[in-house]
Amino acid sequence: MKWMFKEDHSLEHRCVESAKIRAKYPDRVPVIVEKVSGSQIVDIDKRKYLVPSDITVAQFMWIIRKRIQLPSEKAIFLFVDKTVPQSSLTMGQLYEKEKDEDGFLYVAYSGENTFGF
């Protein structure tokens, strides 16, 4: 998947930014959220999040649902590195396992359970 955040900011800039965030907020995780291209789901209004490391993936999904004002009857799927993360994992655990070389965790969302990458 092409990440707009990576295209808009150099690797050096992203590394410096994530290091600053982690130093200032050690109990939080820097997350980039973008829609899977081609998905019919609503666009999100912001893509950078600072998430408490102790919330679960399921709780984070609820935050994203609320951000895009998705009705409860509509489905949403989160992907990290083209796979659906276990919903019981904490965001801190997911971050440690899947963070990018730049220090951010990249999460894609879609209304369909397909990657479309």
Swiss-Prot record:
Annotated positions of the Phosphoserine modification: 39, 87-88
Propeptide, chain numbering: 117
Residue list for modification N6-acetyllysine: 24
A GO biological-process term: negative regulation of proteasomal protein catabolic process
GO cellular component term of the entry, any: autophagosome membrane
Covalent lipid sites (Phosphatidylserine amidated glycine): 116
Expression (tissue specificity): Ubiquitous. Expressed at high levels in the brain, heart, prostate, ovary, spleen and skeletal muscle. Expressed at very low levels in lung, thymus and small intestine.
Any GO MF annotation of the entry: phosphatidylethanolamine binding
InterPro entries the record matches: Atg8-like, Ubiquitin-like_domsf
Lipidation (Phosphatidylethanolamine amidated glycine): 116
UniProt site (Cleavage): 116-117
PTM entry text: The precursor molecule is cleaved by ATG4 (ATG4A, ATG4B, ATG4C or ATG4D) to expose the glycine at the C-terminus and form the cytosolic form, GABARAPL2-I. The processed form is then activated by APG7L/ATG7, transferred to ATG3 and conjugated to phosphatidylethanolamine (PE) phospholipid to form the membrane-bound form, GABARAPL2-II. During non-canonical autophagy, the processed form is conjugated to phosphatidylserine (PS) phospholipid. ATG4 proteins also mediate the delipidation of PE-conjugated forms required for GABARAPL2 recycling when autophagosomes fuse with lysosomes. (Microbial infection) The Legionella effector RavZ is a deconjugating enzyme that hydrolyzes the amide bond between the C-terminal glycine residue and an adjacent aromatic residue in ATG8 proteins conjugated to phosphatidylethanolamine (PE), producing an ATG8 protein that is resistant to reconjugation by the host machinery due to the cleavage of the reactive C-terminal glycine. RavZ is also able to mediate delipidation of ATG8 proteins conjugated to phosphatidylserine (PS).
Keyword DNA-binding: no
Keywords per UniProt: Acetylation, Autophagy, Cytoplasmic vesicle, Endoplasmic reticulum, Golgi apparatus, Lipoprotein, Membrane, Phosphoprotein, Protein transport, Transport
One Pfam short name: ATG8
Compartment(s): Cytoplasmic vesicle, Autophagosome; Endoplasmic reticulum membrane; Golgi apparatus
Function: Ubiquitin-like modifier involved in intra-Golgi traffic. Modulates intra-Golgi transport through coupling between NSF activity and SNAREs activation. It first stimulates the ATPase activity of NSF which in turn stimulates the association with GOSR1. Involved in autophagy. Plays a role in mitophagy which contributes to regulate mitochondrial quantity and quality by eliminating the mitochondria to a basal level to fulfill cellular energy requirements and preventing excess ROS production.
Assembly mode: Monomer. Interacts with ATG3, ATG7, ATG13 and ULK1. Interacts with TP53INP1 and TP53INP2. Interacts with TBC1D25. Directly interacts with SQSTM1 and BNIP3. Interacts with TECPR2 and PCM1. Interacts with TBC1D5. Interacts with TRIM5. Interacts with MEFV and TRIM21. Interacts with WDFY3. Interacts with UBA5; promoting recruitment of UBA5 to the endoplasmic reticulum membrane. Interacts with GOSR1. Interacts with KBTBD6 and KBTBD7; the interaction is direct. Interacts with reticulophagy regulators RETREG1, RETREG2 and RETREG3. Interacts with IRGM. Interacts with DNM2. Interacts with NCOA4.
Family as reported in the entry's similarity comment: Belongs to the ATG8 family.
Name under which the protein is recorded: Gamma-aminobutyric acid receptor-associated protein-like 2
Gene: GABARAPL2
